[in-house]
Each structure stands twice: as C-alpha cells, then as structure tokens.
C-alpha cells in the first residue's frame, strides 16, 4: 500500500543544512496499523508529512497504492491526496461551524451536493459516536469529542490511508484509550491503512501491528510490535519500551543482589514470555530438571495487541553448567533469555 524508498529531507539551518530524514525506506501493508515512534526531534512529523507530500522530500520516492506521488503534477497530486486522510494533535476545527458542518467541509470544497454530503456525513457521525452532538459547536464539546470530529472529517473523502500525527498526545489516558479503540474499529470495519506517528510506546503497544523506530532522521529498528518488545535491539527502543514495561532493575533490588554476584554461582537473567508460554510452568520445569534455586527479582505481565506478554528478572543459583542448561531449556520453549551482566 505505501512504499517509502530512500527518503531524505534537508532544510537550511543557521549553521548549515539540517538533515531531518536520512535515507528512510519503509513498506506498509494494506489494511495494517503501522506505528512510527521516536523521541522529540527524531523526524516523525517530517516523515508523516512526506507521505502525502505536505513536505516534499529532497530525494526519494513515495508510492501509495502503486502511484508515485513524487512524480505527479499539482493537479494529479491534489487528486491523489484525497485518498489520504490526516488527523493531528490539535484538532483544527472551525469554531463557527457545527460538528456536522466541520465534517462536511471537505465535501463542500469538493463541490458535492447537499444530498451527497448528508449521505456521507451522517454515517460517519454514527461511526464516531457523535450523532447526538451534530448541531453543537467545538466550544461545546470535549477534547476527545473534538478528535472524533477530526477523525470523521478525515474520513469524509473515503480515503484508503489515514495518517495520525500525535493525535492522542493532548488527551488524557482514558480518552486516549477510547480514541485508539475507535481507530482499531475503523481499521477493522473499513479496511483502512493507518499510519500512527507518536512518541508514546503505550500507543504502539495498544493498536499497532508493526512499528518503526526513528532516531535522528533514520530508521534504527522495525518489525512486528510483539517482536520489538521481546527483542529490542537499539538503545532508543529499549529506553522507550522501558517507559511502559520496566526493563531496568529497581535500585533497591540492585542493592540486594550486589553482594552475591561474582561468586560464580549467582547469575541474573531477564526472561521474556509471550503467548502460551505466559500460562505454562516452564520456569518451574527448568528448576526441577536442573536442580537450581531461582529468586524472582522483578516482574511484569501485560498485553500487546491481545497477546499476553510477561517479563521477569531472576537470579539463578547453581553450578554454571546447570544454569546454562536451564537457560537453554527455557529458550527451547520459546522464552527470550538475556543475561544481565551490567547489573551493578
């Protein structure tokens, strides 16, 4: 559905050119929810605006539904953009227009008749749960409801792609969950491809199928969300995952284990479980089979896209050969095992 090929974006700066994007290549499948995450200044918003050419990249190609947008003239690009809806952190609603009229605006600009507008807007208001608020003005509704108006407006032209640029960043946690549930519903019912730009790993965890991690304008890691959580490779990814699932041991735990490490018998590991392994007694089986003592230092159980995910930090005590055999057994059962050598 979306192919980004070698995108680079340079802007003039006070001390020379600023490289906002550096050779970014991504493939986003039709009908998936794809997340792009990164810290402030990583290039996320520049990238999402390159997808619909609000920012024309300095080099590279943007292909949407088989069409190279970078090769289109102004008229053809304007038509192609109707296939791409967009929602923002700030709702950009017209205060003088009602909820209904804000959603109808792009259809009015496209020259649609009142009957055509009504046949599109009314089902959209039903979809986003705003039918009863159709005659209210933006000042009379909540932030979450304003974002629902923004979503309905973005869908009015019946796009194939929806771009979300930090659309939940200004919302409280409960409203954020409701908006994310709505986006999942839209993705499921309309088959819409959604690209989520966010700095919140919690958003990625809740709704995205795959994710790309952006740092200094480059993609440093990408893959299925569950795989990235299980095996984060880049330090930026590990730090951002740590915001929602603790990866580092608490200081109080470090103090307890500090005196025992280095004796050759005590080893600290991080174990990650997913799917069926969360419910299976694989750790107990490893203890029984290899005669080890295990001490659970820290743990967390969560859910990623409806799939159970667990993380444990343990201290294994025993002969080194037995400890390694136990870890090999856990890996054979699908558990991700990482020895924490820098614990102190």
Swiss-Prot record:
Keyword list, A-Z: Amino-acid transport, ATP-binding, Cell inner membrane, Cell membrane, Membrane, Nucleotide-binding, Translocase, Transport
Protein EC: 7.4.2.11
One GO MF term: ABC-type D-methionine transporter activity
Cell compartment(s), UniProt: Cell inner membrane
Domain ABC transporter: 2-241
Binding site for ATP: 38-45
Recorded catalytic activity of this chain's protein: L-methionine(out) + ATP + H2O = L-methionine(in) + ADP + phosphate + H(+); D-methionine(out) + ATP + H2O = D-methionine(in) + ADP + phosphate + H(+)
Descriptive protein name: Methionine import ATP-binding protein MetN
């Amino acid at each position: 559905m979306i192919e980004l090929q070698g995108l680079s974006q340079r802007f003039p700066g006070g001390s020379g050119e600023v490289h906002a994007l550096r050779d970014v290549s991504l493939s986003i499948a039709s009908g998936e929810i794809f997340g792009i995450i990164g810290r402030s200044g990583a290039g996320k918003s520049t990238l999402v605006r390159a997808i619909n050419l609000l920012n024309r990249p300095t080099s590279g190609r943007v292909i949407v539904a088989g069409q190279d947008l970078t090769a289109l003239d102004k008229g053809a690009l304007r038509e192609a953009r109707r296939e791409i809806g967009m929602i923002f952190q700030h709702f950009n609603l017209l205060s003088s227009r009602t909820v209904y009229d804000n959603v109808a605006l792009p259809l009015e600009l496209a020259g649609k008749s009142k009957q055509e507008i009504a046949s599109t807007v009314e089902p959209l208001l039903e979809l986003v749960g705003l039918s009863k608020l159709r005659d209210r003005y933006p000042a009379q509704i909540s932030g979450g409801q304003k974002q629902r108006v923004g979503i309905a407006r973005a869908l009015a032209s019946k796009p194939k792609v929806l771009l979300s640029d930090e659309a939940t960043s200004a919302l409280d946690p409960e409203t954020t969950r409701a908006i994310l549930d709505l986006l999942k519903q839209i993705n499921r019912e309309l088959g819409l491809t959604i690209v989520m730009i966010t700095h919140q790993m919690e958003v990625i965890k809740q709704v995205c199928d795959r994710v790309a991690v952006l740092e200094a304008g480059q993609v440093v890691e990408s893959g299925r969300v569950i795989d990235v959580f299980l095996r984060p490779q880049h330090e930026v990814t590990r730090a951002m995952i740590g915001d929602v699932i603790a990866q580092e041991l608490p200081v109080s735990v470090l103090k307890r284990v500090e005196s025992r490490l280095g004796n050759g018998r005590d080893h600290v590991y991080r174990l990650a479980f997913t799917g069926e392994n969360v419910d299976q007694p694989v750790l107990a089986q490893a203890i029984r089979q290899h005669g080890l003592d295990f001490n659970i230092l820290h743990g967390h159980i969560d859910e990623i896209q409806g799939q159970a995910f667990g993380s444990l930090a343990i201290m294994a005590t025993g002969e080194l050969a037995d400890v390694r055999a136990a870890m090999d057994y856990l890996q054979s059962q699908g558990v991700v095992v990482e020895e924490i050598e820098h614990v102190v």
